[in-house]
């Protein structure tokens, strides 16, 4: 058990969870990638090499890197965790009671690293023993999925997010990602590094249907000084924002939550695809998110367990008030209109801050990286020709577990 605390977006990053590309991305095809929320298929080998460079860049900066597959494998060593995961991932109502029982029994005898591989990478009918016979098997093709792959586990930022002294285990918006949450619930409940830990679970760790109250970590920025910024995107709803805000206020972990409405389209999938915090007074932004007509509210406790909502004139004003600074500095996406749109699509604004003024980002975004450099921001470049095709940058691919405040 270790102490976990994330006090900001820009304080010294000390520990982070990543997920190296694996079997789940090998299951992506042109016919299923849209359903699995990818625009294209990736070269998994090259993506893995790029991810190794990313992870090693963090290690070279003295940051602890934990890999999701390792954490899940170690969690499966706990009998209760394995039983719970098999029950949640292999449903009687989806597979039928006899076939589901046979599959659970077969998976339970599997080496834990191999089982973890399937819990993220999926399982086809062609991979099960011929001795498992059932009408369900007889009516499916060998390439049909018993468990669908979870290629979006690559983006560890979204499934859970640590906020001050606690974590939100997020109810995901799209069916293709909802099973990811169970893997994280098991890790945070049973893995020795987290089990019995002195941290709060704000939201998402109950066996209920969260309906429209969805929330994803790419929309949550812990900007520090008692404030949290949340984007209401195509994935995170006002309902999800309210539940998280109430929990933060109940546990006295935040004084205000700033909620900003984002355009509902693919390029603005999450707040961090268009905006990240990179220094005390500095944000990287795609200009569309800071237009004067973008709606923004500040939520504070109303003293009766509810929320007080204040409409803000602009997002920039709300940030200046929350951070106690006179003027926020904005570094916009680089290049002309065409280059800026291309670089935003390739995650130029989705950088991971390691400490104030030092970020990791894709080397391909030359125009925006040049603007960072001129503004005194150090960019540690990583390749992203394959990783970037998943529509996520260094921030998307990382879940901070420990980070200093400001």
Curated annotation (Swiss-Prot):
<protein>
    <recommendedName>
        <fullName>Arginine deiminase</fullName>
        <ecNumber>3.5.3.6</ecNumber>
    </recommendedName>
</protein>
<keyword id="KW-0378">Hydrolase</keyword>
<dbReference type="GO" id="GO:0019546">
    <property type="term" value="P:arginine deiminase pathway"/>
</dbReference>
<dbReference type="InterPro" id="IPR003876">
    <property type="entry name" value="Arg_deiminase"/>
</dbReference>
<keyword id="KW-0056">Arginine metabolism</keyword>
<feature type="active site" description="Amidino-cysteine intermediate">
    <location>
        <position position="396"/>
    </location>
</feature>
<dbReference type="GO" id="GO:0019547">
    <property type="term" value="P:arginine catabolic process to ornithine"/>
</dbReference>
<keyword id="KW-0963">Cytoplasm</keyword>
<dbReference type="GO" id="GO:0016990">
    <property type="term" value="F:arginine deiminase activity"/>
</dbReference>
<dbReference type="Pfam" id="PF02274">
    <property type="entry name" value="ADI"/>
</dbReference>
<comment type="pathway">
    <text>Amino-acid degradation; L-arginine degradation via ADI pathway; carbamoyl phosphate from L-arginine: step 1/2.</text>
</comment>
<comment type="similarity">
    <text>Belongs to the arginine deiminase family.</text>
</comment>
<dbReference type="GO" id="GO:0005737">
    <property type="term" value="C:cytoplasm"/>
</dbReference>
């Amino acid at each position: 058990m270790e102490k976990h605390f994330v006090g900001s977006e820009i304080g010294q990053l000390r520990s982070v969870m990543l997920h190296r590309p694996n079997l789940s991305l090998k299951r992506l095809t042109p016919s299923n990638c849209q359903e699995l929320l990818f625009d294209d298929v990736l070269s998994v080998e090259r993506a893995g090499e790029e991810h190794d460079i990313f992870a090693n860049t963090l290690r070279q900066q003295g940051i602890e890197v934990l890999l999701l597959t390792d954490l899940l494998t170690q969690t499966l060593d706990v009998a209760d965790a394995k039983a719970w995961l098999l029950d949640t991932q292999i449903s009687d109502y989806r597979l039928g009671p006899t076939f589901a029982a046979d599959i659970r029994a077969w998976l339970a005898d599997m080496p834990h690293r191999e089982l973890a591989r399937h819990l993220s990478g999926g399982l086809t009918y062609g991979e099960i023993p011929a001795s498992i016979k059932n009408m369900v098997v007889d009516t499916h093709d060998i390439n049909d999925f018993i468990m669908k792959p979870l290629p979006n586990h690559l983006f560890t930022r979204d499934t859970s997010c640590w906020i001050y002294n606690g974590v939100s285990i997020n109810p995901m918006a799209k069916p293709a990602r909802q099973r990811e949450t169970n893997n994280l619930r098991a890790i945070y409940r049973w893995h020795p590094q987290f089990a019995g830990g002195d941290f709060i679970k704000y939201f998402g760790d109950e066996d209920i249907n969260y309906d429209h109250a969805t929330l994803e970590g790419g929309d949550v920025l812990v900007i520090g000084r008692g404030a949290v910024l949340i984007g209401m995107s195509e994935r995170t709803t006002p309902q999800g924002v309210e539940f998280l805000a109430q929990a933060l206020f109940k546990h006295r972990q935040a004084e205000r939550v700033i909620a900003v409405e984002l355009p509902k389209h693919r390029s603005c999938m999450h707040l961090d695809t268009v905006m990240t915090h990179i220094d005390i007074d500095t944000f990287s932004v795609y200009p569309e998110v800071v237009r004067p007509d973008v709606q923004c509210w500040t939520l504070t406790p109303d003293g009766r367990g509810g929320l007080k909502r204040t409409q803000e004139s602009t997002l920039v004003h709300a940030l200046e008030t929350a951070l106690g600074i006179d003027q926020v500095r904005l570094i916009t996406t680089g290049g002309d209109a065409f280059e800026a749109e291309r670089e935003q699509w390739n995650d130029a604004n989705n950088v991971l801050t390691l400490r104030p003024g030092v970020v990791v980002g894709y080397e391909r975004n030359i125009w925006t990286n040049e603007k960072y450099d001129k503004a005194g921001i150090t960019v540690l470049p990583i390749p992203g020709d394959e990783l970037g095709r998943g529509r996520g940058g260094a921030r998307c691919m990382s879940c901070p577990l420990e980070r200093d405040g400001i």
